């Protein structure tokens, strides 16, 4: 199965789709896309009911974990696409992020 993937340049700003962040709690707290749903990859199978409806952009730090999530979720019938380059490319492109603490957001 081919994993649906998009590069940061192909992601509209503002985002017209939901975002699922599959990074760990400490990574999420340091910086994430505002409005994203956070479900760590290891918890995904047990939390499918919390997923956003409709097309969803799936992100992690560099694109590996999100590719695994997209592969799994697509098999479950979800309309998902992986962000190649992940949050590192998101931040490098100057896209907005927020942190859980109110401090300057960064990619951990």
Predicted regions and their residues:
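Short cysteine clusters
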Residues: 60
């Amino acid at each position: 199965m081919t994993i649906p993937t998009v590069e940061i340049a192909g992601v509209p700003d503002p985002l017209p789709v939901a975002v699922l962040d599959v990074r760990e709690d400490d990574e999420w707290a340091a910086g994430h896309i505002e409005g994203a749903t956070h479900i760590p990859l290891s918890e995904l199978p047990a939390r499918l009911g919390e997923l956003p409806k409709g097309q969803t952009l799936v992100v992690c730090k560099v694109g590996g974990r999100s590719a695994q999530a997209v592969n799994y979720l697509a098999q479950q019938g979800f309309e998902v696409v992986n962000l190649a380059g992940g949050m590192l490319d998101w931040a490098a492109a100057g896209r907005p992020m927020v942190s859980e603490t109110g401090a300057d957001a960064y990619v951990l």
